[in-house]
Amino acid sequence: MWIPSKLTRPGRLHNAIVRPRVLDLLQQAPYYKLVLFRSPAGYGKTTMAAQWLSDKPNVGWYSIDDSDNDGFRFVNYLLQALNKATNYNCSNAQKLAEKRQFSSLRSLFSEVFAEMADFQHECYVVLDDYHLITNDEIHESMRFFLKHMPDNLTVVVTSRAAPPLGTANLRVRDLMIEIGNEMLAFDTEETTRFFNQRIADGIDEDMANNLRTYVEGWPSALQLIALQAQHQNRTLAQTVESVSQFNHAHLWDYLVEEVFDLLDQETRHFLMQVSVLDHFNDELVFALTQREDALGMIESLNRFGLFIYPLEGEQNWFRFHNLFGEFLSHERLARIPQQEKDLHRNAAVAWLKQKAPHQAIHHAQKSNDTDLIVEILNEFGWKMFNQGELTTLESAINQLDKDLLFSHPKLSMLRAWLAQSQHRYNQVGKLLAEAEEEHKKRNIEIDSGYQGQANALLAQVAINSNQPEHALELAELALSQLDPTVYRSRIVATSVVGEVNHVLGKLDRALPMMQQTEKLARQYQVYHQALWAILQQSEIMIAQGYVQAAFELQDSGFRLIEEQQLQHVPLHEFLLRIRAQVLWCWNRLDEAEECAYKGLQILENHSPSKHLHSYSMLARIAIGRGELDKAGKFIEHIQHLMKQSTYHVDWTANASLSLILFWQARGNTEAIQEWLNTAVRPESACNHFQQLQWRNIARAHINLGQYDEAREALDFLQSEAHRTNLVTDTNRNLVVEAILAARQKDEEQAKTLLKEALVMTNQTGMVGNFLTDGATIGGLLEKLSLRHELGDLERHRAQQLMKDISSNQRSRSIHFDEDFIEKLVNHPNVPELVRTSPLTQREWQVLGLIYSGFSNEQIAQELDVAGTTIKTHIRNLYQKLNIANRKEAIVTAENLLQLMGY
């Protein structure tokens, strides 16, 4: 579907004059991020860029048109140009782009930069006519691209207007060369050479200066003047006299009177016909005009100098100069308006022969030939859907009237899938209901296959809307209706059946359904659905207590992502999310944190509401490390997101766990009570997220001293967990039950429950749940271990837990949290200097991190502040504590810790 001419730089520059004053300015271009040619139309931006780069080996060229405002099209063309510039060093990124397997342009560009690390040669990529881009997402992504691209790459932009690419910042930092219309406008010397090259009689300096002043050095106007002199066999003096009133606003009139009317009618008609096309080759022109001499005509007109640019490549691609193309379009609409629809229709048919349905449907829409639009959609609609042309498809479908749209059930279904694929779930049911009603009005009999596809789609919407029973009913109905060959909908329906059984706690049914879904999806190469099935299987296995098996299955998910270039799709974040949850439960916090941050990067360009899970995990990790200030920032994000959006209980339960653990660490019982007052209480607890929500409720009651309510919640939890064989949740519930018993001073019961939990942990490995309440259960674990009440495996686990609890407590001290500082400043033996020159909370944190061996940069990253801010904190604490250097700071911190008994 890609047009070769958009990726080829203009050729045949032998008629262009050499411009040393501009070329001299460009000699230092390799040391700059951006070279910007900015001027109004017709100043030779493209020609100048092409001339400058003509002898450079590593150049990629991208000629932009207004259809490139679609991010998918833009990035595909850009990466093809980059590959040409870097000897195809970005091939993996190109595959990702072609398959639309990226969550945002930023994340895709990160892959590009990683691949470009191996290419060290000077290279250039040209974005020609960038002013046609009006998509803010593309602008923002290109700002990111310019900021982070490797030093050996220079981006060259031609544009009529100042592009919103952060040029002010680049200019201030001296990272941009800007060639404006002042530089591109011909000076007198260049004007003289220009006309001497084209006019037999030549030109003297005075006349050249007059001409240059007359048109303000505008190259296109000078070209028009030269053309007039050539074709009318007039001297330059006569030509100048005839255009004495020429100005930019009169360009169309000038072109008509002095150029266009001089052509024979056949040539004029040919040009107006061809101007329907933005880019063209002889095959397209032949299909459009039925002229067998199409290539000869084009080359003849190119020699004639009528602003037709030949483009590099073997397929004889050409395009009009933008200005001349606009003029021809103006003339076409004025002179042959009755042919407009036929021309666009013929152009659509011509592009179909070039196997470019995207271009074809664009012209079909302009021709308002709805029958042709329907024909293209019926033949290529699903192919375009799979290739990500969603905006184009929706625009075309919206142009159809009701009769046409609903006379073709295939298009009705495509319209509904477009809504689903763009996350407009609430519209899908309405669209399908409307289609059903309209089909009945037209006596269109809907076969069971269509109804099966509709039910599969509605089943997916129902499960997304937390209506599992309805989703199951629809999915099973869809499977009974669908033909075996309709694999996409059968896979979706099978997946929904598995997911519903998972949600209802029927894990033994859910797992085989998801295994079947994965098998079908792999067989038919529907890899997104295969990944989804792997994720569901992993969650089911975790719930069943087979956590190591789930972990290994996740590895197969990561392999699938790598093999099929799925790194940038949102499902990758889902996999990282459940991997982080397992790692947190195994107390592998650094790895869990890495997964959470990777997830945020993948979702960078999605709605902030999708970041809730990542922030929940990051908060939990910070709490586990005792970094409560850092956790507080994540908690603020969580609370803001939960106020702004409505979430599934799976999301809110995870977020609420982090909130409760944070408030527990802060001793904020008021916040816990406020949460409990409004907490959702699911009717059942037959799946992992309902179990988590009820466990949050039990934990809240414990923190508030409401032990009877906590007991009631835990009894309900364990009853449901045993009923549905939720092994891992049973394990987690036992830990909370032990905490409740300890709070109620029932030590024997607490130890019994802990022992049972430790036995189960041999299978699940769930140690993180013990560590969240280390202060409560640490002593109990020690007593269990000393009394030899545990088996060897359980004793080893208990000893490791005690070690981790001790390490976490020390970590909290090293990070100098509020409790530690309060005890320190009130200690009778604390140095007087600490009392009289109290450090701020942040300065204490910085001192603790210095003691832990963190560099200034690492401290800034840890506290999420600027490096200059850290330097200020260090300077202040050095001054307050009379410290000269980092070595003395470490000694001071160590002395304070020893004073406190660490």
Curated annotation (Swiss-Prot):
SMART domains: HTH_LUXR
Signal peptide per UniProt: none
One Gene Ontology term of the molecular function aspect: DNA binding
Gene3D superfamilies, A to Z: P-loop containing nucleotide triphosphate hydrolases (3.40.50.300), Tetratricopeptide repeat domain (1.25.40.10), Winged helix-like DNA-binding domain superfamily/Winged helix DNA-binding domain (1.10.10.10)
DNA-binding region: 856-875
CDD domains, sorted: LuxR_C_like (cd06170)
Transmembrane segments: none
Subunit structure: Monomer in solution. Oligomerizes to an active state in the presence of the positive effectors ATP and maltotriose.
Function text: Positively regulates the transcription of the maltose regulon whose gene products are responsible for uptake and catabolism of malto-oligosaccharides. Specifically binds to the promoter region of its target genes, recognizing a short DNA motif called the MalT box.
Family to which this protein belongs: Belongs to the MalT family.
Record protein name field: HTH-type transcriptional regulator MalT
Lineage of the species this protein comes from: Bacteria, Pseudomonadati, Pseudomonadota, Gammaproteobacteria, Vibrionales
Gene name tied to this protein: malT
